Amino acid sequence: MRAVDLEILKELSEADGIGGREKEISRIVKKYAEGAVDFCFYDNLGSLILVKKSSKANAPKVMLSAHMDEVGFVVRKITKEGYLKLLPVGGWWGHVMPAQEMRVTTMEGKKYTGVIGSRAPHGMPPEEKNKVIPANEFYLDMGVPSAEYIRQLGIMVGDMVTPKTVFREMNDPNYLLGKAWDDRVCVGVCIEVMNALAKEELAVDVYFAATTQEEVGIRGARPAAHSIKPDLAIALDVTTAVDTPFDQGGLQLGKGPVLSVLDSLTIGNSELLAKMEEIAVRQKLPYRHDFMTVGGTDACNIHKAMTGVVAMTVSIPTRYMHSSRLIIHKEDYLQTIILLSEFLKKITSEETRSFKIGQ
């Protein structure tokens, strides 16, 4: 197995960035990928777009998209006792939240640790034990005596709250634990792809859009697509692994990238899908298909941009999405990098334009 640059993944996973607060992540992307591209720029929603130009004039544009934001919270109220009432930003399930360590990031960039409050089970009636606490009812215990103490720390209403999770290799080091793999693992894929292509002569212009605000309505993808005006687009995102005792389904970790046929918001272009399958077979890369009936990816708003964009999604399976700790597999990460790199090396300008429906 090829070596994984764990430092990139560690920095991406441990960085804090909910929708609208993605600057920490965009700085990491720029740090690791700017040297491999011709230029980069930000759009007005904060998406970072990195561009590798073909030497051929009027080359078709291929857009890679991966979102930087993670699910988290903002502080909605500070009680007189110094507790922080939270408002979820993105989708949370109440069962995974009690007693989790979280980190508050102030507007000045200072970071403080707290714990999501939970009731002790002693004497709790059965109906309360079985209740899922709504995510907007949770509070953060900062270990302070008063609201005045909170103010002295510089914490204010509106500050970002994210899981405090340390990235690490697990007992089998092919398994990687961290927060925010949705979608930082795919941001890492795109960084590695741009670096792999740095010295390659391509028939297409490649635009990597590290997008914003996906978890709150797939908002950043559309303005990024309008900025780029791509001929085709590939969204990179995670999908749910179903290989645990709770699920026992088909998508397992470590079996290669996942090609999305459709999800609830996008029907992937069938010719683009077939080309991706062809590249995978040629490179002897395992792959699976996905039909995600709930949720969507950046492809949702990219394919509806302008007069329409040929698009599909390539995914990496992930355990425990939208929680404080997620698990991925190195093999899926590496094989997705290879698949995308080879696709971009092999795709011709004629093929790129032939994918358009009706031509």
Question: Across the structure, where does each feature detected by a protein language model lie?
Answer:
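N-terminal hydrophobic/helix-forming segments and targeting peptides
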Residues: 1-359
